[in-house]
């Protein structure tokens, strides 16, 4: 069998040409990577936002501020019944309930603990 040398050498020549061009691209791309701009540098934001200084903020944050009682209320108090007299308190509520003091318990702790049986340890000590 006779092989044509051009056919046999073609892939190696093609590889060497492509390797050389790839190396040229790599070396040129390494130099151009230093000069390339990032996406933010290439396209600047459309709106420039300047933060305001905190000394200019004179408005209280409503949810974090204490509630100031206002003298003029928007709530119509004409429909509110007058407070009841203390003489009308039922007899059951007259008995003072003594507060029950318990030891503090973590909310996630179990209500009761079941007794455990002795289990030998996995590792012999």
From Swiss-Prot:
Mind telling me where the transit peptide is? Answer: 1-46
User: Which residues does UniProt call coiled coil?
Assistant: none
GO cellular component terms given for this protein: chloroplast; cytoplasm; nucleus
Name where it's found.
Plastid, Chloroplast
Q: Which UniProt keywords apply?
A: Chloroplast, Plastid, Transit peptide
What's the chief localization of this chain? plastid
- State the PANTHER family in the record: (RAPE) HYPOTHETICAL PROTEIN (PTHR33912:SF11), OS01G0939400 PROTEIN (PTHR33912)
The molecule here is called Uncharacterized protein At4g14450, chloroplastic
């Amino acid at each position: 069998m006779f092989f044509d040398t051009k056919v046999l050498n073609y892939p190696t020549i093609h590889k060497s040409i492509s390797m050389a061009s790839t190396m040229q691209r790599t070396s040129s791309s390494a130099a151009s990577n230093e000069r390339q701009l990032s996406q933010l540098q290439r396209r600047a934001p459309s709106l420039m936002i300047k933060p305001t200084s905190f000394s200019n903020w004179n408005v209280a944050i409503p949810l974090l501020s204490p509630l100031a009682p206002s003298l003029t209320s928007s709530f119509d108090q004409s429909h509110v019944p007058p407070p009841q007299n203390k003489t009308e308190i039922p007899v059951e509520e007259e008995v003072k309930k003594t507060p029950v003091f318990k030891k503090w318990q973590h909310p996630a702790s179990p209500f009761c603990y079941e007794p455990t049986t002795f289990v030998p340890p996995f590792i012999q000590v």
